[in-house]
A protein has these predicted regions:
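RNase H-like nuclease fold core
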Residues: 1-45, 53-58, 133-134, 138-141
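RNase H catalytic domain
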Residues: 10-17, 53-131, 135, 140
C-alpha cells in the first residue's frame, strides 16, 4: 500500500507546551488525523513526535512518503543519523545528540517500511501542511 504522511510540530515557548500532528493518506483515498501534546517540551521534539506517532498507526509494511517542513527532521533521519550511530550518538562537535530517545524511536519505526522523506515549505499553501500546522498549534493551547 502507498501512504502519504504530512507532519508538523509546534511549541508555545521553547521549551513550553507543545503539540504535534500528522495526516495519514492511504492510496489518496482515506484520511486519518493523529495529534497530541506535551506540557514541557521543545519544537524539535514535537517535530519528531509527529512522524513517530503516525508510523505507529500503520500496521503492515508499506511504501510511505513523509512530508515535513522541518529540515531538522528530514536531514536528521536521512543523513545525520548514520554518523551519529557510528560516533556512539555523538554529534560532529562530540556532544551527545539531542533528542536521542526520539531519534532511536523514529529510526526503529521506519525499519519495517520503505520510507521516503520530502521537505515541504511551511505556510506555502500546501493543503495538508497547512492542516497539520493548524492541528499542531491547536494542541499548544
Amino acid at each position: 500500500m502507498k501512504i502519504k504522511i504530512y507532519t508538523d510540530g509546534a511549541c508555545s515557548g521553547n521549551p513550553g507546551k507543545g503539540g504535534w500532528a500528522a495526516v495519514i493518506l492511504d492510496n489518496n483515498t482515506n484520511q486519518s488525523d493523529v495529534f497530541g501534546s506535551e506540557k514541557n517540551t521543545t519544537n524539535n521534539r514535537m517535530e519528531l513526535m509527529a512522524p513517530i506517532m503516525a508510523l505507529k498507526k500503520i500496521k503492515s509494511s508499506s511504501e510511505i512518503t513523509i512530508y515535513t517542513d522541518s529540515m531538522y527532521v528530514k536531514n536528521g533521519i536521512t543523513e545525520w543519523i548514520k554518523k551519529w550511530k557510528l560516533n556512539n550518538w555523538k554529534s560532529s562537535n562530540k556532544k551527545p545528540v539531542k533528542n536521542k530517545d526520539l531519534w532511536v524511536k523514529l529510526d526503529n519505526s521506519c525499519k519495517k517500511h520503505k520510507v521516503n522523506w520530502k521537505w515541504v515549505k511551511a505556510h506555502s499553501g500546501n493543503k495538508f501542511n497547512n492542516l497539520v500546522d493548524q492541528l499542531a498549534v491547536s494542541q499548544t493551547k
